[in-house]
């Protein structure tokens, strides 16, 4: 009989026999299998120079390299003579040249007003009128202002943006939304031969607006870029008559107590109160005509609700009108002899919002007196849905590729706003 080795004898001597739950593998501790501890090793002690009063430490600073037995020298922080932007330390806010003790509530392009249009009307001291003005609707209904093969060309614009422009099977909203608006503007420009005064306009992109006003005791500012902006050499004519403007004195603005009217606005102590239209002095197209605001976020959570988009349109149109009025009539709050009119179009590529704002007064501090006017036409569908891929059931094409539920009246209003002031 062969003699068993030492480990084998120890295993056989155990009452439970072979290990690993009786499978013949001996049990060992965790460290016997080579498993290391997950505890991090202690950091090495810091090399420091112990200062003893009356004694000077001997370091290897003069040697210019490490020497065992000598203390590690302590050098002062290195000053390269310039500051890297990554490591620049900003001064305290109170030392900023534009710092002010009075807080300013700023509305920028990503602000979402909690109360929507109702809050925007209070901030701008404006009276809301549903629907577009009769003057604009008459331009939309007049067949002389229509484009040749208008409906067919608009359908081609929609198909170009949703189907032909992108190589993706289903283009994203951020891709097709700007293409639709740009193509519709180009389609409106084709009327220059019929209306030569349309050549006195230009479309600018990403201009920065900044204007500030007092609303009661609150300082409010609109700051940022609204997207594409149509500017003209000549201002838009007033919409409401003098009698209609005087009648706004009796209008009472709706409040939303106990909610603060400045909710959703950004509080800031660093701001500039000077007005800036986004264009230099002497710009040949100084008058704002129409703002085109796009809501092209792909994720639904990042999109503006329709009411929030209309509120954004009101504030940016009001900011452009106020900056233009102060440029023409000065900074003193007063009732304007010639009201300033600014239009706005907002869309997500499918649903359009139309707006016309008339600035009647720059006296915005009190609730009394003349109010501004805004006409809003909400939720106008250009088309119901667009099938990027055909729907096939039982080898039969149920839904072909293309738009469904096309509504030509929406583009007529779009065209009427573009032609307003030139016809």
From Swiss-Prot:
Domain of life, source organism: Eukaryota
GO cellular component, one term: mitochondrial large ribosomal subunit
Sorted UniProt keywords: Mitochondrion, Ribonucleoprotein, Ribosomal protein, Transit peptide
Location of the protein in the cell: Mitochondrion
Signal peptide annotation: none
Listed GO biological process terms: translation
Transit peptide location: 1-29
Main location: mitochondrion
Molecular function terms, GO-annotated: structural constituent of ribosome
Entry's family note: Belongs to the mitochondrion-specific ribosomal protein mL37 family.
PANTHER family tied to this protein: LARGE RIBOSOMAL SUBUNIT PROTEIN ML37, MITOCHONDRIAL RIBOSOMAL PROTEIN L37
Oligomer status and interactors: Component of the mitochondrial ribosome large subunit (39S) which comprises a 16S rRNA and about 50 distinct proteins.
Name this polypeptide is given: Large ribosomal subunit protein mL37
């Amino acid at each position: 009989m062969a003699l068993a080795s030492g480990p084998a004898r120890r295993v056989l001597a155990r009452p439970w026999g072979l290990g690993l739950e009786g499978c013949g593998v001996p049990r060992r501790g965790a460290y016997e299998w080579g498993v290391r501890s997950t505890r991090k090793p202690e950091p090495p002690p810091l090399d420091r120079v112990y200062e003893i009063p009356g004694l000077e430490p001997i370091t290897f600073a003069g040697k210019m390299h490490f020497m065992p037995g000598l203390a590690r020298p302590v050098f002062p922080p290195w000053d390269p003579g310039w500051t890297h932007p990554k490591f620049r330390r900003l001064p305290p806010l109170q030392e900023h040249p534009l710092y002010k003790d009075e807080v300013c509530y700023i509305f920028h392009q990503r602000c979402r007003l909690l109360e929507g249009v109702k809050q925007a009307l209070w901030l701008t001291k404006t009276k809301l009128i549903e629907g577009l003005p009769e003057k604009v609707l008459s331009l939309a209904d007049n067949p002389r202002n229509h484009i040749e093969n208008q409906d067919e060309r608009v359908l081609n614009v929609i198909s170009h943006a949703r189907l032909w422009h992108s190589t993706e099977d289903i283009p994203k909203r951020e891709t097709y939304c700007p293409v639709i608006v740009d193509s519709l503007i180009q389609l409106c420009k084709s009327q220059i031969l019929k209306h030569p005064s349309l050549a006195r306009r230009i479309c600018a992109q990403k201009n920065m607006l900044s204007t500030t006003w007092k609303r009661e005791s609150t300082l409010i500012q609109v700051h940022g870029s609204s997207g594409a902006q149509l500017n003209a050499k000549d201002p838009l004519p007033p919409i409401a008559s003098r009698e209609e403007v005087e009648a706004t004195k009796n209008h009472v603005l709706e409040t939303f107590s106990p909610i603060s009217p400045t909710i959703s606005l950004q509080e800031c102590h660093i701001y500039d109160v000077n007005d800036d239209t986004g264009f230099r002095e002497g710009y040949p197209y100084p008058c704002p005509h129409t703002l085109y605001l796009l809501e092209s976020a792909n994720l639904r959570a990042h999109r503006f609700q329709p009411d929030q988009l209309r509120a954004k349109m009101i504030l940016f149109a009001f900011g452009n009108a106020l900056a233009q009025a102060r440029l023409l009539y000065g900074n003193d709050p007063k009732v304007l002899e010639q009201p300033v009119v600014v239009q706005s179009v907002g869309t997500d590529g499918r649903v359009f919002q139309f707006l016309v704002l008339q600035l009647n007064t720059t006296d915005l501090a009190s609730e009394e007196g003349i109010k501004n006017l805004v006409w809003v036409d909400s939720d106008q569908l250009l088309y119901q849905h667009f099938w990027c891929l055909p729907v096939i059931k039982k080898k039969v094409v149920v839904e072909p590729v293309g738009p469904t539920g096309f509504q030509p009246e929406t583009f007529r209003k779009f065209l009427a706003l573009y032609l307003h002031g030139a016809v």
